[in-house]
Design a protein with these regions (language model features):
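Beta-strand-enriched cores of mature, soluble protein domains
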Residues: 25-168
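Bacterial N-terminal signal peptides that target proteins for export
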Residues: 2-11
Length: 168
């Protein structure tokens, strides 16, 4: 019985310290909305085993406020059509919030098939690795689930996840 009391007391102390130390200027920002944007492509030099993609999305209907995601990524043909949870591309993403602060992420994407209209279905998991301004030290993750018309470069879909902003 003493062990249970000791473990309970240690757990209570740990949780109190953890909650108090992160409460100042800390918070969780939920991301849940729609995205729309476009991409452009450039083939790899010989041998052409893939292509580079550059693009951007905009969104205005999340708790984060209006933002734009800018990205560049190499895409290897060997990964196209891979099953879910297999890396298709990785990239560094900068999301500019309304006041100009940014969030940096690392992305892993895959192409689990086609959308109902025949466009490419792309699912990307973004891990937040930091940021600037009020997002310095931010952590969290979000998922982009989108359809891409490869002929026009137009893309649209949804974004969902959380950003954990640490107190200073």
């Amino acid at each position: 019985m003493n062990n249970i009391k000791r473990i309970s007391l240690m757990t209570a102390i740990f949780l109190t310290v953890a909650l108090v130390s992160s409460a100042v200027e800390a918070g969780v920002i939920r991301i849940n909305g729609t995205i729309a944007g476009s991409e452009s492509y450039a083939p790899f030099p010989n041998p052409a085993e893939g292509f580079y993609v550059n693009g951007s999305f905009t969104s205005t209907d999340t708790q984060l406020g209006p933002f734009t995601l800018f990205y560049s990524a190499p895409v290897d043909f060997a990964f196209l059509g891979t099953p879910p949870e297999t890396a298709g591309a990785s990239r560094l993403v900068v999301g500019d919030a309304a006041n100009g602060d940014s969030i940096l992420t690392c992305d892993l994407g895959n192409n689990p098939g086609s959308c109902a209209n025949g466009d490419l279905h792309i699912v990307e998991t973004n891990t937040i690795v930091g940021g600037t301004g009020r997002y310095a030290g931010a952590r969290g993750s979000f998922t982009l689930d989108r359809c891409l018309n490869f002929d026009t470069g137009e893309t649209s879909g949804t974004i969902s996840g959380t950003i954990v902003v640490r107190g200073r």
